[in-house]
Amino acid sequence: MDEDVLKEAIEQYKQQIIQIQTVLESGQIEGRAELAKLKDDLTELIQVTEESLLSLKKSQLLQLLEQQESSHHDSGTPETDTKTSVDYRNSYVNDHTIDDNDDEDNDENIIGTKCRVAFTQEWGVKEHHNAMVFKLESIPLDEETVDQAKVRVLFLNPTHRSMVPCPYFLEGKCKFAGAECRFSHGYLVDVEHLKPFKEPDFSSVKAGQRCLARYSDGVWYNSTIKSIKHESHEFLIHYETYNTDATLPLDDIYPLGPEEVESDSESDSQSDTGDSSSSKAAIEQDDDVIRYAWKPTGALSSLGDWEQHTKGIGSKLMAKMGYIFGKGLGKDGEGRVEPIEVVVLPQGKSLDKCAELREKNKLKEPFKRKKKKLVVASTTSASQGKASDVFDFINHKLGHSKGSLHDLRVSHPGAKPDIRKTRKSADENTNWNIQLFKIHEEISSVKKQLNKQEEALQRHTTRDSRNKTIFTEKRDSVHNRLQELLKKEKKIQEKIHQKDQHRKLTVF
């Protein structure tokens, strides 16, 4: 069916429901039960049609992806795919679809690594939170340049609903994009910005201490420990947000240290529910330092050295004005010889405060950020070596603290996805006609997918045998799905026939 036809059908069904609702509200007694049943059937039919519309949009998207994939394969040149010179696109396909077993093993080793990342809330509060690596991603910049290595992390102690991992996303069933979903689909972080995981310290936990406690909605709120049951390892805590008490196990508590409590009290003025996991005192102390953005090396020849990367217009202008290289500036050549350093003053500080910092020699050398980038290698061995460097960097920086994605999936109460009913085989009130209509729509969609897979397989029949094997497996998978749907269709038709025969016998 066309997308516009389905939308028009949905609008017609809604108009019919409005008309039926008007008749029911008028107070007529005759046929009231039939109208109510008709209204329920129309409501269910609207739901089925909307699902069909959604599957149609998905099939269109899959068609677009298949076209891109086929064009991606057609652009390759297998003749030039040698060990010494590999085309970028062919190497990417071969490395990531067939010969990427080592990278997949490395990905599995990285997944679940615990770390600590900086996160800025929507209201501007910057905090540090414990997290766990969910996936390793690389953002391509250019075919001839490098890939920027990033990881997608999930927060272990989310302090806001937008940070709670989406349960449907973890199951691979979420219908919303990351920005549209009210829960988190992961947070992208540069590998170089990852910090070591901070283990909760239960050695000095006592009554009256501040902590983060998990609530029924999966969010960790600011709380206070009232008492401790040492035998059962349970805590009686008081939620400050809800003003209620609860008894929680050890896994639902995250004790806050003195620095975290201090930073939390400072951030409460900006947010009602925000919790800071890093010390703002250390940040403010770091802001009171004058930094050199650039500082000369001290050699006399350093003046103008940067012009080897430019046209040297500055040196030419100075030479026209009579400047002799090696001497100082000024009329008599007694001025400064070295270039002027670039100084970045602390933001929001007065000149008197900056002068005081100069006297205290609080001058900080510029730091160079070590950017770890995933280089796209021309050979398989080179790409595996670079990927292992990123993995080694993560393991070296974060240690070997590992977690389980299953713990995130079932960690917070009420976060499990609801089990939706797909078929009521034993229910007498099941509308088998609607089920049959739904199966017909799905069969039609799968047949279209099967035709596309067969066309793609025919295009790659005379080409690389490895690509042919991939498309053959895809075709067989879609064909098996079609056979399952045909069996379901046959069973539903038998159910409808039995129901009709039973009704005829009952009337007789």
From Swiss-Prot:
One of its GO terms (biological process) is negative regulation of transcription by RNA polymerase II. The keyword Disulfide bond does not apply. A zinc finger (C3H1-type) spans 161-188. Its main location: nucleus. CDD domains: Tudor_ZGPAT. Residues 67-86, 253-282, 404-426 are annotated as: Disordered. InterPro entries: G_patch_dom (IPR000467), Tudor (IPR002999), Znf_CCCH (IPR000571). Transcription repressor. This is Zinc finger CCCH-type with G patch domain-containing protein. It comes from the Eukaryota. Residues 259-269 have a biased composition (Acidic residues). Residues 69-86 have a biased composition (Basic and acidic residues). Residues 310-356 form the G-patch domain. It is found in: Nucleus. Keywords: DNA-binding, Metal-binding, Nucleus, Repressor, Transcription, Transcription regulation, Zinc, Zinc-finger. SUPFAM superfamilies: Tudor/PWWP/MBT. One of its GO terms (molecular function) is RNA polymerase II cis-regulatory region sequence-specific DNA binding. Residues 270-279 have a biased composition (Low complexity). GO terms for cellular component: nucleus. PROSITE patterns: G_PATCH (PS50174), ZF_C3H1 (PS50103).
